[in-house]
A protein has these predicted regions:
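Beta-strand signatures of extracellular beta-sandwich domains
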Residues: 76-79
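Loop/turn positions that initiate beta-strands
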Residues: 57-58
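Short beta-strand segments of immunoglobulin-like
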Residues: 44-54
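Extracellular/periplasmic metallocenter environments
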Residues: 2-11, 19-40, 47, 68-69, ...
Length: 148
């Protein structure tokens, strides 16, 4: 094989690897909220969300937490309707996504199907954690880019 053939082969391999990487980058992610620790009281999920962003349309969040009786603090997950509800930890009008027992085993999944803010929070403990800025976060998925 001469130099030009080797060079063309190397360039072709490079293009293939780049396209493979781009295709991988365009796949929706499944993201465990809180990583290996899961969804638990007293945790700053805003910091977690910053570290795990950007979120993209069709990504899926997985919420896992111990069932009642295995934890000193019961957990739940709500989707709050707007920023004001999120800031004030007002759960009227919120949608319960997962009650105290639904985070067990494999947890439950929430698909981020729209380009809009998703306001997640726990209402447990009279919303103490939420009011302290804990056990809540915002995810704003964007369109996944196919170019670098």
């Amino acid at each position: 094989m001469d130099f030009s053939s080797t060079r063309m082969l190397a360039q072709g391999l490079f293009v293939f690897l780049m396209l493979s990487t781009m295709a991988e980058a365009t796949k929706p992610r499944t993201i465990l909220v809180g990583d290996s620790q899961g969804w638990r009281a007293g945790t700053n999920y805003t910091q977690w969300a910053i570290q795990n962003s950007p979120f993209h349309i069709n990504d899926t969040l997985v919420f896992k937490y111990p069932p009642p009786g295995n934890s000193t603090v019961t957990q739940s997950v709500y989707l709050l309707p707007n920023l004001w509800s999120y800031i004030t930890c007002e759960f009227r009008g919120a949608k319960l996504l997962g009650n105290a027992s639904e985070g067990d085993d494999e947890g439950f999944k929430v698909a981020l199907n729209e380009s809009k803010p998703y306001y997640f929070a726990s209402a447990e403990g009279n919303s103490y954690d939420c009011l302290a800025g804990l056990t809540k976060f915002i995810a704003v998925p964007s369109t996944r880019s196919t170019t670098s």
